[in-house]
Amino acid sequence: MKDKIIDNAITLFSEKGYDGTTLDDISKSVNIKKASLYYHYDNKEEIYRKSVENCFNYFIDFLLRNHDDNYSIDGLYQFLFKFIFDVDERYIKLYVQLSSAPEALNSEIKHHLQEINTTLHDELIKYYDPTHIALDKEDFINLILLFLETWYFRASFSQKFGIIEDSKNRFKDQVYSLLNVFLKK
């Protein structure tokens, strides 16, 4: 039941944010009484905390499961495409919602962000090849991270308004433009 509560809470928090999600919403989503939630969790903050933790664990697991050993420009393109469009949309939306998380969770969220950024940095650096890329390592990483953050923000809206297929087509054009910026001619 604890896992089901968190799974449903992730959906609710991703759609309504922390403030918009109530314990009533969560209890109804798992067909239990609100009082029964307290058997499993102390309060809404604890449920949110666990939801955020699961979100970051999902991203790290996704990164580690979905890379391949093709550390080329084509491999980078495939990696970016997977990391944007194959991630469960609930986690993208929850990630975007973190900017309005309770202040009491700021240090935990910062820790999770640092952990995911380290994992992502370590994965992206494998694609860096100075014989093909005109930027230094840090500029390369920063440009890719900026691109991903922008796409996650955009994808959260695309999912909401049902235009994800159009976004995939634009992504192809934009990632080629991005790659052309830092590829040596």
Swiss-Prot record:
Domain of life of the source: Bacteria
HTH tetR-type domain mapped to chain residues: 1-59
Phenotypic consequence of residue 33 to S: 5-fold decrease in DNA-binding affinity
The entry's keywords: DNA-binding, Repressor, Transcription, Transcription regulation
DNA-binding region as annotated in the record: 22-41
Induction entry: Repressed by ethanol.
Ranges annotated as spanning the membrane: none
DNA-binding recorded as keyword: yes
One Pfam family hit: TetR_N
Assembly: Homodimer.
Functional description taken from the UniProt entry: Represses transcription of the icaADBC operon necessary for biofilm production.
Protein name: Biofilm operon icaADBC HTH-type negative transcriptional regulator IcaR
Organism, as annotated: Staphylococcus epidermidis (strain ATCC 35984 / DSM 28319 / BCRC 17069 / CCUG 31568 / BM 3577 / RP62A)
